[in-house]
Amino acid sequence: MAAILARKSLSALRSRQLVLAGQAWQQGANTSNGTLLGTRTFATNDSFSTDKDDEEREQLAKELSKDWNSVFEQQINTLFLTEMVRGLMLTLKYFFEKKVTINYPFEKGPLSPRFRGEQPLRRYPTGEERCIACKLCEAICPAQAITIEAEAREDGSRRTTRYDIDMTKCIYCGFCQEACPVDAIVEGPNFEFATETHEELLYDKEKLLENGDRWETEIAENLRSESLYR
């Protein structure tokens, strides 16, 4: 790289010198012709270099100096590995600063009360199922992930005999929670439910009720905190 820059600089300087030599020779020839013809000439500023020539020389000198400075700086960086040292210093700086990550899964960040995760089916405090088999959640689900079957009980109330959710279809839009008149189906706080098989993601009623029993305290608190905005 240094050799290329030096070669270019010398070529530019040689070209400039040839141009100046040609101009000087032309001026000398004109002066000789004027003397032979008896024309009296006097030395003026035009016989020497003009301001434009001086500016061009200064500009050329600056460019040469700039090129050599860049070559020198590059050689210094290569010799003393300054760029590597600069990178190591940056690493050392962040080594002692406060960490921006957490040690997942042993540490977990906070979740919003509006977080939409794995769904549960809730119960009343008495243990009775909340779901009344109105099928509004099944009707509003855009992914058609919910399947409900129901029958009437002896007391005349309706309860589900089948409540399935295909978690591979669910898009966690929360429409089922908004449509439910009794807060039976909600979006839960759990996001860690990866499985090894597809069948494990086909949730039945027992699985959903089990989720509801596990997270009831947290779900009730989230619904209470968000009740002002519903």
Swiss-Prot record:
EC number: 7.1.1.2
Recorded GO MF terms: 4 iron, 4 sulfur cluster binding; metal ion binding; NADH dehydrogenase (ubiquinone) activity
Co-factor note (free text): Binds 2 [4Fe-4S] clusters per subunit.
Domain 4Fe-4S ferredoxin-type: 122-151, 161-190
Catalytic activity: a ubiquinone + NADH + 5 H(+)(in) = a ubiquinol + NAD(+) + 4 H(+)(out)
Entry GO terms, CC: mitochondrion; respiratory chain complex I
Alphabetical UniProt keywords: 4Fe-4S, Electron transport, Iron, Iron-sulfur, Metal-binding, Mitochondrion, NAD, Oxidoreductase, Repeat, Respiratory chain, Transit peptide, Translocase, Transport, Ubiquinone
Required cofactor names: [4Fe-4S] cluster
Species in which this protein is naturally found: Nicotiana tabacum (Common tobacco)
Superkingdom of source: Eukaryota
PROSITE patterns named in the record: 4FE4S_FER_1, 4FE4S_FER_2
Subunit structure: Complex I is composed of about 45 different subunits. This is a component of the iron-sulfur (IP) fragment of the enzyme.
Subcellular location, record wording: Mitochondrion
A biological process from GO: mitochondrial electron transport, NADH to ubiquinone
InterPro entries: 4Fe4S_Fe-S-bd, 4Fe4S_Fe_S_CS, NADH_quinone_OxRdtase_chainI
Annotated protein name in UniProt: NADH dehydrogenase [ubiquinone] iron-sulfur protein 8, mitochondrial
Residues binding [4Fe-4S] cluster 1: 131, 134, 137, 180
Positions contributing to [4Fe-4S] cluster 2 binding: 141, 170, 173, 176
Span of chain positions assigned to the transit peptide in the UniProt entry: 1-42
SUPFAM superfamilies: 4Fe-4S ferredoxins
Its biological purpose: Core subunit of the mitochondrial membrane respiratory chain NADH dehydrogenase (Complex I) that is believed to belong to the minimal assembly required for catalysis. Complex I functions in the transfer of electrons from NADH to the respiratory chain. The immediate electron acceptor for the enzyme is believed to be ubiquinone. May donate electrons to ubiquinone.
Sequence similarity: Belongs to the complex I 23 kDa subunit family.
